[in-house]
């Protein structure tokens, strides 16, 4: 590798460390010509094939940005979003393929998001799964309730153990969840929020 300081074509590695998540390698290099030291980061590329057919490199920050929109107004910290983004990337990399469809990224987000916050899950799912009316919301809410019942019945002492499987950016403009003060046609969720479909 060329030295970024003197452009000498030869540098040597003096230290190598694997990142905590195991997905990248940090190397410390030294230039024998000018003596300068610098670091490089090596990582495998994970590609995402979009519905348009275009292929782009997976970006964990895009996952976090998309989920952050669904979590607006919810008691979710930035650290929670970072952990979810890491879970999504780990899940996709664990599949052992170099390229994944964008739909699979969405599915990988939904699983841990449901465990993190059910309201945010409904917001994200409404866009990812293209909800068209209140009936779609009702089906999603019923599915949430059924999954909660299964978890409780399967665990001793009434404590459900959630299996957080590792979970791209979607625009959150089609649907919103507002406080129970609105007068429009709506439906109240178990968490005390009114689900209202809106168009933009």
From Swiss-Prot:
unnamed zinc finger locations on the chain: 3-34
Pfam families linked to this entry: ATP-cone, Zn_ribbon_NrdR
Keywords: ATP-binding, DNA-binding, Metal-binding, Nucleotide-binding, Repressor, Transcription, Transcription regulation, Zinc, Zinc-finger
Domain ATP-cone: 46-136
Superkingdom of the organism of origin: Bacteria
A GO biological process held by the record: negative regulation of DNA-templated transcription
Keyword Transcription assigned: yes
Cofactor(s) needed: Zn(2+)
Record bears the keyword Zinc-finger: yes
The record's free-text note on cofactor binding: Binds 1 zinc ion.
Molecular functions (GO terms): ATP binding; DNA binding; zinc ion binding
Stated role: Negatively regulates transcription of bacterial ribonucleotide reductase nrd genes and operons by binding to NrdR-boxes.
Family statement: Belongs to the NrdR family.
Alphabetized PANTHER family for the sequence: TRANSCRIPTIONAL REPRESSOR NRDR
Protein name: Transcriptional repressor NrdR
Organism for this UniProt entry: Bifidobacterium animalis subsp. lactis (strain AD011)
Name of the coding gene: nrdR
């Amino acid at each position: 590798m060329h030295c970024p300081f003197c452009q000498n074509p030869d540098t040597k590695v003096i230290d190598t460390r694997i990142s905590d998540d195991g997905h990248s390698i940090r190397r410390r290099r030294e230039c024998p010509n000018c003596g300068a030291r610098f670091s490089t980061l090596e990582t495998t590329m994970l590609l995402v094939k979009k519905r348009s057919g275009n292929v782009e490199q997976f970006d964990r920050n895009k996952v976090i940005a998309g989920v952050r929109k669904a979590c607006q107004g919810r008691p979710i910290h930035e650290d929670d979003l970072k952990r979810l983004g890491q879970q999504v990337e780990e899940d996709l990399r664990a599949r052992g393929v170099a390229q994944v469809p964008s739909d699979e990224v969405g599915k990988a987000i939904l699983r841990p998001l449901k465990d993190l916050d059910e309201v945010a899950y409904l917001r994200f799912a409404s866009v990812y799964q293209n909800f068209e009316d209140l009936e779609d919301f009702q089906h999603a809410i019923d599915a949430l309730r059924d999954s909660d019942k299964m978890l409780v019945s399967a665990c001793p002492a009434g404590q459900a153990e959630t299996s957080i499987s590792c979970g791209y950016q979607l625009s959150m403009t089609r649907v919103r969840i507002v406080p129970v003060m609105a007068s429009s046609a709506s439906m109240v969720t178990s968490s005390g929020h009114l689900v209202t479909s809106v168009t933009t």
